[in-house]
């Protein structure tokens, strides 16, 4: 693997991590607060 390809793959990995983790936490938090409000 060339260094530029490795850097590209790592940037994809970190970009995915940076996007996916906050979205997942946010969705879980919203669904939890929705349950409390709606008394489901």
UniProtKB/Swiss-Prot annotation:
UniProt-listed GO biological process terms: photosynthesis
Transmembrane segments: 10-30
Membrane topology, as annotated: Single-pass membrane protein
Subcellular location: Cellular thylakoid membrane
GO CC annotation: photosystem II; plasma membrane-derived thylakoid membrane
Top-level taxon in the UniProt lineage: Bacteria
Statement: the UniProt record of this protein carries the keyword Membrane: yes
Keyword terms, alphabetized: Membrane, Photosynthesis, Photosystem II, Thylakoid, Transmembrane, Transmembrane helix
Record's keyword annotation contains Membrane: yes
Assembly behavior: PSII is composed of 1 copy each of membrane proteins PsbA, PsbB, PsbC, PsbD, PsbE, PsbF, PsbH, PsbI, PsbJ, PsbK, PsbL, PsbM, PsbT, PsbX, PsbY, PsbZ, Psb30/Ycf12, peripheral proteins PsbO, CyanoQ (PsbQ), PsbU, PsbV and a large number of cofactors. It forms dimeric complexes.
HAMAP family: PSII_PsbX_1
Similarity comment: family membership: Belongs to the PsbX family. Type 1 subfamily.
Role according to the record: Involved in the binding and/or turnover of quinones at the Q(B) site of photosystem II (PSII). PSII is a light-driven water plastoquinone oxidoreductase, using light energy to abstract electrons from H(2)O, generating a proton gradient subsequently used for ATP formation.
Name the record gives this protein: Photosystem II reaction center protein X
Organism from which the protein derives: Crocosphaera subtropica (strain ATCC 51142 / BH68) (Cyanothece sp. (strain ATCC 51142))
